Amino acid sequence: MAGHASWVLAIRFVWLQACLAFMMSSFSRLAVSSKMLATFAWVALLSSCAMATSVAPPVKGNPQLKKDHYVSYDNEKFGYRKWLPKSTAHQDPAIVIIGVHGISGHAGDYDNLAHYLLKHRQDVALYAAETRGQGMDPKECRRGDVRRVEQWYKDLVVFTELVRQEHPKSKIVWFGESMGSLIVMHGYQNARREQRPHAMAISSPIIEVDSELPTWKLLAAKCAAILFPKARISLESLSDGRRPMVTKEDIHEQQAAKNPWYIRRYTLRLLVGLGDLAQSMDQMAPAVSCPVLVLHGGKDFFTQEDKVNDFCKSFNQSIDKTHHYYPGSYHLLMYDHQRVQIFSDISSWLNKMGDHQRSSK
């Protein structure tokens, strides 16, 4: 979970400062003129269209759900956690939540929510997988990087299908927190109709990196990611001395930096990819045809209330949409001081699932 307090800031600074500085410093060491730099940058941008159409041969994987890990579409293995009520010994739970954690987080971030649900009801199970490129990725060289954001969507769909096979009678709910909200929203858009969940919960969504960024700076940042996709940047070095509070007590971030899943440096392509996902969140909402729950704290440094309100309004008016706003809460709602109330609201929303049939278009 470490890095939540700085990853959005990092994307902003990558787009505003870091990428430009990285480009200029790299080329200055090579004594390249500014004219040549500009020419090379535009060539890279124009050629990116061709690069995007170059698709590697598909890998035929053998997806499987093992005791402590699952095998994804490309035979890569990722750990996961599950919290099952005792009732699953003789019947499928009514609802299975599939949680997607935030940046520099891990599957255990859903522990608080899971234990609340296990204590208060016996009809809900929760699964949460480790995200590719994050701190519990078994391949250390891949931590802090992702080749394409589409890999996240594919992993989510595969994991969901494997969980469905375990609980064929259960309704599936995707739950995305922070960066996870980007993955579930875009994953829904990219999934086939039969692969989509019955409902989605969006906690602390990241909506727009910065609407005031000049177009030329956005292009420069994307150019840097094309030229140096695997170059890594420390999030702390980009924070400009700012350390936003992510919970009321604000001790989680200090502790998280000591965790084994903490990532100190991220690649440019991952950060710019996240920025692109955040910028297009509003465009994803109209395609959603299942019930949606949106949770947001009034003291969330990264996304303002009006942005979340606009995001909620962009969903189709025909769907069941619930928006809970907590004026005194911060970004990490599942760790914050109002979490018991938030968990209670989530549980109440889940009660409505029995009134809905699976709806996906």
Model regions and ranges:
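Conserved alpha/beta-hydrolase
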Residues: 117-140
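Catalytic nucleophile-loop/oxyanion-hole region of alpha/beta-hydrolase
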Residues: 106-107, 135-170
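The serine-hydrolase catalytic nucleophile loop
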Residues: 103-115
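Short beta-strand/loop motif that positions the catalytic acidic residue
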Residues: 288, 294-296, 300
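Short beta-strand element of the alpha/beta-hydrolase
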Residues: 93-102
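Catalytic active-site module of serine/aspartate enzymes centered on a nucleophile-bearing elbow/loop
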Residues: 327-361
